[in-house]
């Protein structure tokens, strides 16, 4: 089986994968879930990509790299420096080469759901429950609230993406059909128009590793074995 590296997004730390990881280990996959730095306000895309790269064993040959939400933005930088089996964008953002993230937002189409604008789920419990954990069981939602972070993305948002050529690597995109943060319509569009792939859909909110870990593990395991 392959090594699956799970990269958390901007609102939860690496503990967010604790329900998913055991399901991926059942068929024999090895799992990594690196922690991105939350105490580096000047961190840009290259810094986050370096953290991911440094977490990968040098001798690992069949690496499936999965990123959730904002961290999808860093995957091409990793793939440009390390041979990978495939990239999996899980309800994730993608960079537009030659543009900053803010440039991409202005150019459209709309990436985020309108009601998500200005919300801070780290400080606002109601926002976290409504936008991130609305389809989780009460027990899981209570635990998930303890994993909240805010990843510094100021430089990521304003810098021109530091890559001039998209890496040659197989890619897949998982759309969360009940997502209340990242627009499912945008996710479907970006999968087809930017990655050139048919999106895979899960009937879940933004965090299916919490609400549907068994289903998500099945999808990821299949991708890790067939790509």
Question: Model features per residue range: what roles?
Answer:
Residues 66-71, 75:
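Gly/Ala-rich beta-loop-alpha elbow adjacent to hydrolase catalytic centers
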Residues 30-64, 101-110:
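Active-site loop/oxyanion-hole signature of alpha/beta-hydrolase fold enzymes
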Residues 48, 210-224:
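Post-His helix in hydrolase/transferase enzymes
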Residues 173-175:
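Short beta-strand/loop motif that positions the catalytic acidic residue
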Residues 177-203, 210, 222-223:
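Conserved loop-alpha-helix segment in the C-terminal half of the alpha/beta-hydrolase fold
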């Amino acid at each position: 089986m392959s090594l699956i590296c799970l990269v958390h997004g901007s609102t939860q730390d690496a503990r967010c994968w604790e329900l998913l990881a055991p399901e991926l280990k059942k068929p024999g996959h090895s799992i990594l879930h690196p922690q991105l730095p939350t105490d580096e306000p000047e961190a840009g895309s290259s810094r986050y990509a370096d953290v991911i790269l440094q977490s990968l064993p040098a001798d690992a040959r069949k690496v499936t790299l999965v990123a959730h939400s904002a961290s999808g933005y860093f995957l091409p930088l990793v793939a440009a420096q390390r041979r990978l089996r495939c990239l999996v964008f899980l309800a994730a953002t993608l960079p537009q080469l030659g543009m900053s993230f803010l440039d991409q937002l202005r150019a459209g189409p709309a990436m985020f759901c309108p009601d998500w604008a200005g919300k801070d789920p780290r400080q606002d419990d109601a926002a976290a429950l409504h936008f991130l954990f609305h389809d989780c069981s009460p027990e899981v939602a209570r635990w998930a609230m303890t994993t909240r972070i805010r990843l510094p993305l100021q430089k990521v948002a304003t810098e021109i993406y530091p890559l001039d050529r998209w890496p040659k690597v197989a890619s897949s995109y998982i759309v969360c059909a009940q997502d209340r943060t990242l627009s499912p319509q945008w996710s479907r569009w970006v999968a087809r128009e930017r990655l050139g792939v048919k999106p895979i859909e899960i009937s879940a909110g933004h965090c299916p590793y919490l609400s549907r870990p068994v289903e998500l593990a099945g999808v990821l395991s299949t991708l890790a074995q067939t790509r």
